[in-house]
Regions:
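Residue(s) in the substrate-gating loop at a strand-loop-helix junction
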Residues: 136
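The beta1-alpha1 cofactor-binding region of Rossmann-like NAD(H)/NADP(H)-dependent oxidoreductases
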Residues: 56-66, 98
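Substrate-binding pocket helix/loop in short-chain dehydrogenase/reductase
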Residues: 92-93, 97-105
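Active-site helix of classical SDR
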Residues: 116, 152
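Conserved glycine-rich cofactor-binding loop
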Residues: 13-14
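Active-site loop immediately N-terminal to the catalytic Tyr-X3-Lys motif
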Residues: 94, 141-147
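Conserved glycine-rich Rossmann-like NAD(P)H-binding loop of the short-chain dehydrogenase/reductase
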Residues: 27-43
Length: 164
């Protein structure tokens, strides 16, 4: 269908995900950019015509499956996934807000696991595909006022290493 490579990047609205989306788009890739904040994705679309936005809540399995299907329907396949999903709320750590820490775990760890699970069948079917998972140095050592974030990135690092 289309001979350009297709990369799906989650967490593409800010930070590393946004930077990667722009760099891949400038290199000629079709970038399927996903994040929760649709307004930031729309801003990203304006930067380069090779970037298409696919709003996504990584914690919602049905939404994740829908996004994978939309990307495949639009481009024919997904060649590479880069999962940069992440959130942090330093204020929740200071007050030890368990519900916020659970949300951090849900997004940073389970959300990435969910994304891997949603793309897995597609990669098996086409017998090809690569996954890159962006974690953090916080996955290897504790940081002040960041216990929930560090725990989520540590779990993500261990999960990623188990995929080899």
């Amino acid at each position: 269908m289309i001979n350009k490579k297709i990369i799906w990047i989650t967490g593409a609205s800010t930070g590393i995900g946004k930077d990667l989306a722009i760099k891949f788009a400038k290199s000629g890739w079709h970038v399927a950019a996903s994040a929760r904040r649709e307004n930031l994705l729309l801003d990203l679309n304006k930067i380069n015509q090779n970037i298409s936005s696919f709003p996504l809540d990584v914690t919602n399995t049905e939404n994740c499956k829908e996004v994978v299907n939309k990307i495949i329907n639009r481009f024919g396949a997904i060649d590479i996934c880069v999962f940069c999903t992440g959130m942090h709320d330093p204020n929740s750590e200071k007050r030890f807000n368990l519900s916020k820490i659970r949300e951090i775990m849900e997004v940073n760890f389970f959300g990435v696991m969910n994304s891997v699970n949603c793309i897995y069948d597609h990669f098996c079917e086409k017998k090809n595909g690569k996954i890159a998972i962006v974690s953090s140095v916080a996955g290897y050592r504790g940081l002040p006022a960041a216990g929930g974030y560090c725990a989520s990135k540590s779990a993500l690092t261990s999960f990623t290493e188990s995929l080899y």
